[in-house]
Amino acid sequence: MKRTTIMSLMTVVALALAGCATTKNGDQDEQAPVSDIAFFARTTGEHPDKSADSELQELIASVKPGYTQGSYTDEETGLTVPYNLYLPPDYEASKSYPMVVFIGDATTAGTDMDYPLTQGWGGLIWASGDAECIVLNPVYPDVVIDDHDAYTVTDYVKLTPRLIGEVAGTYSVETDRIYGTGQSMGAMTTLYLASNYPDLYAAVLIVDGQWPAGQLPEVASQHIIYIAAGGDDKAAAGQEELKQYLTEKGVGYGEISQLDAQADRDSLNGQVQTMLDEGNAINFITWASGTVMQGVSSNITSEHMASFDYGYKLSAVRNWILSQTK
C-alpha cells in the first residue's frame, strides 16, 4: 500500500480516532487505509498504554483465551466480516444465553483480531464474572462510519444486523436479550443500529460517540445508557442534542453529570444506581471535565480517547443493561 508522509498520515489518524472515514459518495464510502491508521495509532499515535491497569491485564490473561475467531460473509453485499466470539465455559446448546455485541473504536478496524480485545475493558468485561454471556466482537476491515461530513454509514454497518442474526441462529442465544455496546466509532454504529433497527437490541451502552438525533428515528423507544466525557466536545454535545430531542418528544430520561471518574468505584456505582432506580429507559452519564485524564499515558491528549474504560468499569451500568429484555 502506498505510504503518505508522516504528517499526512497523522492527519488521517486524527480523523480515524474520532471514529470516521473521509466520505464523498453517500453510503458508499471511499475508505481510509485502516491497516496503516490502526498500526500508526497504536504505536506512535494517540492510543493509551494500559499495561499499568492490573484489572485489565488480569482480564486479558483470564478471559481472552476463551475467544475464538470466525467470519461472516454477507449474501446481499458479498462483504466478509471477521469476528471474535466468546462462549461461556459451560456452554450447553440446550440452554439459552444473553449475547453482547461489542464494536470498538476506529483503531480496532483492520486485520488484527487480538487488538480489539486487548485495547480495553469493552470487549472483555462482558465475558467475565457470573453473567454467562455470549460475546460477539465484529472486527471490521475498514472504518465504517463518518461523523465529519454527511454522517453516513457503509454497507458494513448495514450488514451487521444480519451478522448478529447469523450468530444468534447458530448458537443458543436468548434473542430477547441481545445487547449492543461500543466506543467512539462503535458507539456511533451501535446508536445508529439501535435506532434504525429497533428490534435488534434489548438495550445499548453508548460510550463517547454521537449521531444526529434527526437520523435516529426510533431512538426514543430504546433502552439506553449514554456515557461521555465532559471534555469530549462532540460526544457531550451529542448527549445534549439527544436530551433536547427527547424533551421535544415528551420522553423522560435520567441523567447524572459532573461525575468524578477518579472517585471510589463503590461511590460511583451508588450514584449511578440511584439514577437508574428512577426507572427511565434512557439515561445519561457525563464525567466531569478533566477527571478522565488523570493517570493516562502521556501520549493521550484528548478526553475522547482517555475515557472509554471508565463506563465499562461500572457494574451498576453493566447490570442494568443485562437486566433489560425486549
Q: Which residues does each predicted region cover?
A:
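C-terminal catalytic histidine-bearing segment of alpha/beta-hydrolase fold enzymes
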Residues: 228, 232-234, 252-326
